[in-house]
Amino acid sequence: MQCYTELLPPSGVTHAISLPFLSATSNNLIVAKTSILQVFSLVNVAYGTSAPPNADDKGRVERQQYTKLILVAEYDLSGTITGLGRVKILDSRSGGEALLVSTRNAKLSLVEWDHERHGISTISIHYYEREDVHSSPWTPDLRLCPSLLAVDPSSRCAILNFGIHSVAILPFHQTGDDLVMDEFDEDLDEKPEGASNIPAQAAVANDTTMYKTPYASSFVLPLTALDPALVHPIHLAFLYEYREPTFGILYSHLTTSSALLHDRKDIVSYAVFTLDIQQRASTTLITVSRLPSDLWKVVPLPPPIGGALLIGSNELIHVDQAGKTNAVGINEFARQASAFSMVDQSDLGLRLEGCVVEQLGTDSGDILLVLADGKMAILRLKVDGRSVSGISAQLVSEKAGGSILKARPSCSASLGRGKVFFGSEETDSLLIGWSRPSQSMRKPKVESADDVFGDHSETEDDEDDIYEDDLYSTPVNQTTLSKTTSQTNGLNKDDFVFRSHDRLWNLGPMSDVTLGRPPGSHDKNRKQSSSRTSADLELVVTQGKGNAGGLAVLQRELDPYVIDSMKMDNVDGVWSIQVGAPDSTNTRTSSRNYDKYLVFSKSTEPGKEQSVVYSVGGSGIEEMKAPEFNPNEDSTVDIGTLAGGTRVVQVLKSEVRSYDTNLELAQIYPIWDEDTSDELSVVSASFAEPYVLIVRDDQSLLLLQADKSGDLDEVNIDGILSSHRWLSGCLYLDKYHTFVPTKGQDQPLSDNILLVLLRADHTLFIFSLPTLTEPLCSVDGVDLLPLILSCEPPPKRVTYRETLSEVLIADLGDSISRQPYMILRTANDDLILYQPYHPKTSLDKPELRFVKIIDHFLPRFDPSPKAYMPHSKFLRAYSDICGYKTVFMSGSNPCFVMKSSTSSPHVLRLRGEAVSSLSSFHIPACEKGFAYVDASNMVRMCRLPSNTRFDNSWVTRKVHVGDQIDCVEYFAHSEIYALGSSHKVDFKLPEDDEIHPEWRSEVISFMPQLERGCIKLLSPRTWSVVDSYELGDAERVMCMKTINMEISEITHEMKDMLVVGTATVRGEDITPRGSIYVFEIIEVAPDPDRPETNRKLKIFAKDDVKGAVTAVSGIGGQGFLIMAQGQKCMVRGLKEDGSLLPVAFMDMQCYVKVLKELQGTGLCIMGDALKGIWFAGYSEEPYRLTLFGKDNEYLQVIAADFLPDGKRLYILVADDDCTIHVLEYDPEDPTSSKGDRLLHRSSFHTGHFTSTMTLLPEHSSSPSADDPEEDDMDVDYVPKSYQVLVTSQEGSIGVVTPLTEDSYRRLSALQSQLVTSMEHPCGLNPKAYRAVESDGFGGRGIVDGNLLLRWLDMGVQRKAEIAGRVGADIESIRVDLETISGGLDFL
């Protein structure tokens, strides 16, 4: 009874495509990350300096233009995406094109953008995994066969090649076609609505439309029906410039094989077929035979080039429409592997396996090749008329940006205007721009960042500051980004220059993971601090391949970088004040306008608060006397500035006080009811130049406006505003005209002030100031929290409603993109985010709607008295916290609401205790930082940590090493990380081999490459390498572990040692050998300039063994280790002379991939890559390894670990099919044969290739169990709970959590309800996605935590209905969801 929850989505990009998706004129990028589908728009921004020396004759300044990616929508699909295609359909809802998504097991989903829902809408889904298609006994399983999606450039049909020989053809209706929907053969055709229609697109109002769906009936054919010679297809793609759908295909009549090259040389053929969809026939146009056997891809080329480019491992071949070929060999093996006629360019020495091809523009024959190591090459096709007369290749130099990509790209998408996107699973995905040096003297008309995003007050002109705050732009490389000529950089005028515009971070592939301790708190007064601001542990994973290798440091909560801190008693609030000069109107736009005052509110007695004012200067903060500042010791509600920063307004409980820039009293405005003369109190306040909104305790409103002199005057409120009661309200400056359309270029910003109010009956009103007579919009039933908030009336019969406490509309984003969001806070501190949008239904008066943002934030319940905060206003917006526009929620669940240009809004917790107040803080020592007060009365001045990303609910930092990191281990005693890295080196056959004397005469310059390992020490204080140990030729690190070992047989001294297992592999026909290293990390005198270099590696023991050392672990309590060497598992101990003495062993079968011990028990598991998992035990008297049980399924083990659950012992196993299996050792079960057989309880398909499994430290399943102040006699025993952390090659992180019987029943029933009651993106079934076909064990399956968390996305009424069907209440389900999504409090 377990639950799998994905904590971090995959980040490696697998597929990408560009198309006009949101509208007919838009340019969108669609990105697939295994199971995540993201929609991006593009925006051009310009950076530069306004210094006069860079100005031209007219005083204009040329600024560097960048294209940035802006995330529009993101969807988690219940399937693994295998292909994307663009289809132009008739009468799309957006006016743009539709997207065709292929997923694993032969499924096609056709989706389009729906402006009514502000999201994707599934037109249809088509299934082709029918049994009759795969009835042949020798046909491989469908899940083992890759699928290929190809779409006709004219959108007449799409082909899905699946199951090796099967193709599904899906026609699409186009203007003028003669397809008939009503005529189809039921024995051969699919139904006209497809296998499913979710929902079918409604019939359009145009009477001339003759089709109900944009597609016709699809059908499945074997490839041999098109041509009997298509026995072994390799690759196919549709071609351009044909009247009918025409595709080119690579195939062979025999299976290609490098080992049989002498007999199967040049057996590949290329053919072009034209499809007649109506007759289901094909016509062969051309056939080119005797092609090289290493061809693997067809790349269609648009006009004017036309034809197709065939890519092989050693050559490139162009085939035009008439079958004429031109070829070039790019390494010396091209001549040896093929007799095909080609131009010799073997001096390039390129390896084309896994390369990506993209055409540079449509008016030339230049093609960009990105190789597997990230290097770039330009392929030039010499065009003579409409035919290609020659082909040549040239590498791109580093000066021209040829080394921008560090590893192999997985896909590419041309975005037009000199922009190409390269997605990668091995490094960051890049948006790259290209140009020629001859164009550098041109000055293109670009938009500045100010023109794109509106008012200049939130942007900076200083170039250094811009790049410091722009967390998502690539740092400027003066070599490749400066405007150069051939005289300055040595480039020819026809060469291409590449530069990076934007990037999508990738945390994969995660090959290893460890838990380490942060280097320590940055708090200067750490001894005075009574609360933690740094994590106990941090998660460190390896990421990247090749030159892109490095580490990623992950934390679940935000650890602020503390500049300074101090202890103050009875502090309730903190506010920073930034004032402006009275004679200047542009002062506030300067980035150097620091805060002048810092105000603290201190409780003196009930109902009384003292305002303590500090003066902020370059030397720090000093307390100052301000006798006129709140002399009556009234409670402060909020503090802000008006009149261009010349008036400081302090809103107190009983009055509003206005001060000048020196905090001298200028005005007092009382808070009282003019009609009854009753004294009222202020509940909350909101500022927006020149207004201040006040909500009083009788739920009435007071709106004040500052005149030109700064004096406050009351704005007359009539009608709705005066006759109703209001729960909450705020003011919002609509800079970007999201709510109110633009009225003119000269419209002042004061005309864009919105008054947002939440009525007592939870009706939302939005007014556009100064108009207060009629609301801009009103939304009923906000407390129902539906997916879409609109002006339509809610359902009449509603039983359940949410208790809302606060509403706020604020901008969220970074320096690239900022968008307004409405944030609702409930009485339980739940945060619900809505994004405003216009559905484009009426152009005269656009309707305003709000769509709910998906974020599964669950606040923690803190029963302690410190968690109680007296202030009623918990949400506060900030315009610039280290470059972010963000919202902070104070209270017992302190958190930021963050958003970047490439991510959706999400909640990020602030580590530590409850926070009573937080304010922005901008001084020279803490630029664009923040100051906050926690429940322990500790005041901290902080900044967000540098070089850190906040794109998701985890705080992420990447450390670039430059080599591929295969293993990582934390050495706790020395507080340092040990890395097992590798880099490629040329391999040459040994000349002294006596068995193969012919190797001595081998003459070759294009060497094969092998991995050579290196062991490095990395300091977490500076994240730099402090020591390294180079391994031998062809020797690489296979495993690494920190083990507490006995280093002396006499004294029995125990010490932590670093144990490394290696393998020396020189070829498949040479037996591999291995070595076991035992290192001691010693302390040495550091380099004076680098104090972190005080650690060195010292070899304590080394032993060469037969067979590779593939896994190692500690075992028992005597300081021994167990290692897998070849086909044996052996227990060894250290001797006095530094040798390793074997004491016990066990014979294995093939290749031991996993070897782990349940710490301190002697129980261990041994995972064979081909023969399943073994469960054994180690005894010390006598030394012996005993096999207890093993599985009978022969699982292909990739990763495994223990999962204790009370008195039960489970073993989790991840196989090569992205599936997690749950095994149990239960000798009392009759079906286990007295324990000899591990019981297979359940299976769960994750969709990701699991790389590691890690048993996390135990934690209490109940918060009260960890409270040391509780009396042990009064608290029931709460068992410790374990979790297993799962990482993947795609960069995702998940956790497997054991469940109690009651929780499992509730969540299992809830999962069944959600599968049938929710609409799923692309129409994919979550239950079918997670199920395993061979899962016939009858056990209880693993529940899907991500599907269960979608229950939180529902409206309140819908959640209650689903909970009622399950037989539970809302609170019990929330507790269960907190269990499956939490537990990692130490990170």
UniProtKB/Swiss-Prot annotation:
GO terms for cellular component: nucleus. GO terms for biological process: mRNA processing. Residues 440-493, 509-534 are annotated as: Disordered. The keyword RNA-binding applies. Residues 474-491 have a biased composition (Polar residues). It holds the Pfam family Beta-prop_RSE1_2nd. Residues 458-471 have a biased composition (Acidic residues). Residues 444-457 have a biased composition (Basic and acidic residues). One of its GO terms (molecular function) is RNA binding. InterPro entries: Beta-prop_RSE1/DDB1/CPSF1_1st, Cleavage/polyA-sp_fac_asu_C, RSE1/DDB1/CFT1/CPSF1, WD40/YVTN_repeat-like_dom_sf. It is found in: Nucleus. Keywords: mRNA processing, Nucleus, RNA-binding. It comes from the Eukaryota. Belongs to the CFT1 family. RNA-binding component of the cleavage and polyadenylation factor (CPF) complex, which plays a key role in polyadenylation-dependent pre-mRNA 3'-end formation and cooperates with cleavage factors including the CFIA complex and NAB4/CFIB. Involved in poly(A) site recognition. May be involved in coupling transcription termination and mRNA 3'-end formation. This is Protein CFT1.
